[in-house]
Amino acid sequence: MAKWQRSFFQPVLPLGEDGRRVTGSKEHIALSRMAAGEGMVLLKNEKNTLPIRKGTKVALFGKGTVDYVKGGGGSGDVTVEYIRNLYEGMKIKEDEGKVEVFDKLAKYYEEDIQKQYADGAVPGMTVEPELPDELLNEAREYTDTAIITICRFSGEGWDRKCEAAQDGYVLDGEEKRNSELSAKIFENGDFCLTNAENAMVEKVKKTFPHVIVVMNVGGIVDTKWFRDCDEIQSVLMAWQGGMEGGLATADILCGDVNPSGKLSDTYAKNLEDYPSTANFHESAFYVDYTEDIYVGYRYFETIPGAAERVNYPFGFGLSYTDFDWKVTGASEENGVITVLTEVTNTGKTAGKEVIQLYYGAPQGKLGKPAKVLGAFKKTSILQPGERQILTLKIPVNQMASYDDLGKVCKSAYVLEAGEYAIYIGTNVRDAAKIDFTYVVKEDTVTEQLSRKAAPYHLQKRMLADGSYEELPQREYVEEEGLPRQDKYAIGLPCPDTRGQKGIDFLDFLDSKGVHFSDVADGKMTLDEFMDILTLDDCINLLGGQPNTGCANTFGMGNLPEYGVPNVMTADGPAGLRILPKCGVNTTAWPCATLLASTWDEELVEKVGKAGAEEVKENNISIWLTPACNIHRSPLCGRNFEYYSEDPYLAGKTGAAMVRGIQSQHIGASVKHFAANNKETNRKDSDSRVSERALREIYLKQFEIIVKEAHPYTIMSSYNLINGIHASENKELLTGILRDEWGFDGLVTTDWWTFGEHYRETKAGNDIKMAAGYPERIKEAYEKGLITEAEIRLSARRILNMILKID
């Protein structure tokens, strides 16, 4: 196929064999189902209640039985042919002769939920109906086994238990509507059960001797109500499993799949136990990251007294079988520590196990978390009695800490003198210290850098003993420039966009005498092509372009007279997002949190590859995924799009996704760079974070992805970082991303940012989406506020990215 033919030729050209479409294909849907099963986490299984024995009769309780949430809202939503809920999944198992389902109860929920849908409700944002005693008693006469399903939904643009801040910020528009609806349904906040759900659970517990709970959620929720409850024997964290999530859940409940997922977050006893909760809603205009590097398990495993406030530790997950493991070797060579671990299936069922390596650095002058994830491996399916040796490697320099205040060596990654312990286990809590210690004889600088993106107004941060240290304060003085535009005017489309000139564009004879395909064919260099472009041509490249075909998030490029295609972009993290009006059904993949919970890089790469095939088949060139922000707080409404509280797990999962996507010569757009951990007032909220926490926690996953997977594009975030919009932050986008990490791709804004276009270009943000402001760039250029070289550099990066795409 000719270069960029899909950008010019709008009818879909199938990628499958014999002219078949791969979009929403049986093969892709089967992969989605399999991935969902791999990431679901068995939290509890007393008396081996699961898997359900063949022939067992079951009664399905809770609206979540039919009100299935495949994924979150916003960019993570996907248009699909169908969504399989748990009732439908269990009916398939009934047809296979494995269980029998009490239909009357399920039909009761089905009728109620359909009425709520007809009144405008969306999955997960419905009210739990009252459970009639008569129906409860009929169900008990039918069976002694109950399955309760609890579901939750959240989405882009609003946070969980969203509150009006103390500083006068007023919720408006979608934020206000979603927050008010959530408050109406979830009177205790959606972290906890509603009063109606509590009443239903209590009835079921008192009536049935065998109770199983399924959690169809996208993030952290309350676990107290089942953690130590003897009346509830089994709990499956089923997450939001995509379009086949209900069937994937049934696969596990009935024993067709042995659960092997592990938590990618720490589940505390109470919402208030997370250090981020106290100030999450303190202000709509800023968030102080005072817990610093002590996020998730780094907090709970380190801070005195915090460990006892954990219900389920990071990395935890049960299986239907048992495993033993032992370290068979540990050594260091050429700066890399290698640990060999033999895993044996000692149970009666085939299954998989995940071995996790943590390191513990000496406290020294900087202070460190007690344990930090350094490597992990998942076994293949092990039959009873079968064993496998896993090789886990960690570079010594990975254990270094960043010194932002000069306690050892300012603005440097440092290995402080002392013993570095290595722990091996199947979760952070049970990881045991092995008989190997790496010793650093003297303080060693592993990488000397310079201060970048440091805070101005963060007053204090947490230390390893739970106390706080004061931080130096600075004043930020913005560089002189054009008077800033009204923020909400910036959100309007720019009128100066350029339409595509026809679909049979490969045969178009342009009037410039050159064609961009000459660069792709090696007939001329990109620099030679750039020399032909005028300054106006370059400025026109710096903004998003109109949609073509089924795209709905705009394009990039589009200089028809030079043969530069208008390459389309599309959401999102859970699959190719095409508006329903286009009539294209795609595959809805499991949410990002579930994918991270597989702890399986190879599987995630397969999902990325399959998703990219659908993107490519529908003439899209850039897929706006993966989303890699840290789960700082359970209250962030967009956590379902993100992988983990841990940057290493998030980075390795994200890198696998990018490798899979870009194997199809489709550009992945890794987002949201960076510290985008709150949706309320997301375009104007300042993330105040120390440089150490920024580098070790909130940038580290992006660094891993950039260095291991080489993404074509990075998307800067809406929020400010230490007083400067991320899209205008030169220290972040040029100093760290490009100069330190070696990123050679394109940086795009998120859609309709509040940043000034010319300031974004100067910072290294190459293109403003969904549309640019060429008149502002021209005005800034004429007043000497931006140079032609800066404009041409961003234009060149855009063209270079297009050259990488089929």
Language model segments and positions:
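Glycoside hydrolase catalytic-domain context in secreted enzymes
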Residues: 1-430, 451-806
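Short beta-strand elements
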Residues: 430-449
